């Protein structure tokens, strides 16, 4: 399957099983998923402990990739879709209830996935560079997966 010939690895050079992909502007949408402060903005510590400094250093390559590749590429896609009048949709994790009682079991459990993002929480908002415009769909979900 190839969308175009510019970004096809030589591995797929002769793969024509799926043929050309035709993008029908009326049937195609861009779905931007979880581009929220809580996931893609570096945490800020007032007086970081040594452990927090080490953890920040460990995560720095991730945040650099977010800043230099993920956000700019999402912004380019958003611009292109909007200029073409194509549908743009967003999905974000956020509770519907302030106490978070509607969260998934994963996000209620303690540990890695524990997350409480009630309505109005700044960290739940989509970063400004990728923010939805008026009349764009935003689906609020209470767990990690959107599909």
What function would you assign to each model-found segment?
Residues 137-147:
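Glycine-rich oxoanion-binding loops at beta->alpha junctions
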């Amino acid at each position: 399957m190839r969308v175009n010939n510019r970004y096809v690895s030589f591995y797929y050079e002769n793969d024509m099983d799926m043929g050309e992909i035709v993008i029908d502007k009326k049937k195609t949408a861009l779905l931007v998923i979880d581009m929220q402060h809580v996931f893609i903005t570096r945490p800020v510590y007032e007086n970081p402990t040594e452990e927090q400094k080490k953890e920040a250093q460990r995560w720095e390559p991730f945040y650099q990739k977010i800043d230099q590749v993920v956000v700019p590429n999402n912004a380019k896609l958003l611009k292109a879709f909007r200029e073409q009048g194509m549908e743009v949709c967003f999905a974000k994790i956020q509770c519907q209830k302030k106490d978070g009682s509607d969260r998934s079991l994963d996000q209620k459990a303690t540990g890695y996935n524990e997350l409480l993002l009630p309505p109005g929480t700044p960290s739940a908002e989509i970063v400004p560079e990728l923010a939805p415009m008026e009349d764009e769909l935003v689906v609020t979900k209470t767990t990690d997966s959107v599909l």
